[in-house]
A protein has these predicted regions:
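Short alpha-helical linear motifs
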Residues: 174-182, 212-216
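Alpha-helical elements of Rossmann-like donor-binding domains used by nucleotide-donor carbohydrate transfer enzymes
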Residues: 6, 69, 73, 134-137, ...
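Conserved FAD-binding catalytic core of PHBH/FMO-like flavoproteins
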Residues: 1-89, 102
């Protein structure tokens, strides 16, 4: 358990502030916390997500949350962002978890995928995405081995270990960047200030540019290395 808590809520478009109805994922960052909001269902709803470092000893799980707890971690947030915390009528609370990347998650005729194999924090928003990539890769490995379970599992695991480990470790680092304080915060702000959007996109090409063909190619690359 990481000690990082995530609150999520959905707000109807009719109740969302007009000056914050941006057609993009928007983030407000601060020491040990951040807030994200973005449109859903073509702008009919807005997702509001807050993350903070909990003061409590957390146990993994999902429960109902309270606005009072959220506000206690965002006392010095600017008023424009604070109004977003006031909007939801109810919150869901996640105590998050990850683990050190591992090289093996296959055991005989049993293999794992998604969070069961490589749980990650939410800072890269890649938990479900990695599970889908795993599924495509595993399916292709089964196809090319004519459903030889042991060979397919071996190919699948080798094809996925490095990328999923990079996600886990990068997500941790992104959390540090979002939640920086003191001098680290000043360095972050200086690096981000005035940076063209294209530079951010280029830096994340390895992540968001990945598609089904990459999964298929990864299987092909490892297919000849499995006896």
């Amino acid at each position: 358990v990481t000690g990082h808590v995530v609150y999520r809520a959905v707000v109807p478009e009719s109740e969302f502030p007009e000056d914050l109805k941006w057609n993009a994922a928007s983030i407000w960052v601060g020491p040990n916390c951040h807030l994200v909001h973005y449109p859903l269902r073509g702008g009919k709803e807005y997702n509001v997500v807050v993350t903070f470092h909990s003061r409590e000893q957390e146990q993994w799980g999902v429960t109902d949350g309270s606005k009072e707890e959220v506000l206690s971690y965002f006392q010095e947030i600017c008023q424009k962002a604070r109004q977003l915390i006031e909007l939801p009528k109810s919150w869901r609370r996640w105590a998050t978890a990850d683990r050190e990347p591992i090289e093996t998650w296959t055991f005989g005729r049993v293999t794992l995928l998604g969070d069961a194999a490589h749980p990650t924090t939410q800072y890269m928003a890649q938990g479900a995405c990695m599970a889908m990539e795993d599924a495509v890769t595993l399916g292709e490995a089964l196809r090319v081995t004519d459903h030889n379970i042991l060979k397919a599992f071996d190919i699948y695991q080798k094809a996925r270990v490095a990328r999923t480990a990079r996600i886990v470790l990068s997500s941790r680092e992104m959390g540090k960047i979002y939640h920086a304080k003191g001098v680290q915060r000043l360095v972050r702000n200086d690096l981000w200030r005035g940076r063209p959007t294209e530079r951010f996109y280029d830096a994340m090409e390895w992540l968001y540019g990945w598609n089904v063909n990459n999964c298929l190619d990864a299987v092909k690359n490892y297919q000849g290395n499995v006896a």
